[in-house]
């Protein structure tokens, strides 16, 4: 039977996917999700004290027999630094959406302060796991500190300068598109324009239906492209099953 921390992880993933697909939650649903997530704050006994600034203080993912849990856009993290931070950031993001005050504000402020003491969160480190961890920080900053344009831009520069340094998991680039779908508009639009042709190439492909991860990726690509004025018309479009091939597709063309 899943423990309480596993249930919190599942709730975080399902809620994020629902919102990415354009779903809307009622106030009672928001309140219930908030309560369940707040009940799963870690105890002092589960906190990691080695290099404490690198690891979450409020939420860490379940043990899962030592296997790192995937991020909401499927990446299988290779280290706890990436997995643990991604998990905490996503929960804090949901809490911020549903109850942006009081203890939630305190946790976000504490986390921002923690990140300023990390190489991957504040010092533009791009080596090993720090590149992916820095991406998780960028998504966190987009809601936690949208006014800090310099910090946001610094993390973007790390991505642009070092993404091509080596071969990366296919989900890394798509995670960046997820980040762009929620980033402050004035910073996001030039980056989306830079990524536009690559996103179009991917969104116009067909995908195997049984692969659920491809479904959420199509919505991420839709949401990102739709921020550009010339693609605003696709904002509410849904993926569909091609009658001939039986594969999942998305129509990004004009009406």
Question: Which ranges hold each PLM region?
Answer:
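Preference for long, amphipathic alpha-helical scaffolds in soluble/luminal domains
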Residues: 1-255
């Amino acid at each position: 039977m899943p423990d309480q921390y596993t249930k919190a992880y599942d709730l975080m993933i399902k809620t994020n996917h629902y919102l990415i697909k354009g779903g809307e939650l009622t106030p009672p649903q928001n309140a219930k999700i908030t309560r369940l997530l707040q009940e799963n704050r870690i105890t002092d006994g589960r906190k990691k004290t080695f290099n404490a600034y690198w690891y979450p203080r409020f939420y860490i993912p379940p043990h899962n027999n030592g296997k790192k849990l995937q991020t909401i856009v499927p990446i299988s993290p290779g280290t706890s630094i990436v997995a643990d931070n991604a998990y905490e950031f996503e929960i804090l993001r949901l809490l911020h959406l549903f109850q942006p005050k009081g203890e939630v504000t305190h946790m976000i402020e504490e986390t921002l302060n923690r990140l300023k003491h990390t190489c991957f969160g504040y010092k533009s480190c791009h080596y090993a796991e720090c590149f992916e961890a820095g991406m998780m920080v960028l998504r966190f900053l987009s809601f936690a500190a949208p006014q800090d344009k310099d910090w946001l831009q610094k993390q973007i520069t790390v991505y642009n300068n070092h993404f091509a340094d080596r071969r990366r998991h296919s989900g890394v680039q798509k995670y960046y598109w997820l980040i762009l779908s929620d980033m402050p508009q004035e910073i996001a639009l030039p980056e989306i324009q830079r990524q536009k042709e690559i996103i179009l190439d991917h969104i116009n492909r067909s995908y195997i239906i049984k692969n659920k991860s491809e479904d959420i990726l199509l919505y991420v690509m839709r949401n990102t492209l739709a921020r550009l004025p010339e693609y605003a018309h696709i904002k509410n479009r849904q993926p569909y099953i091609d009658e001939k091939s039986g594969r999942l597709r998305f129509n990004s063309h004009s009406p």
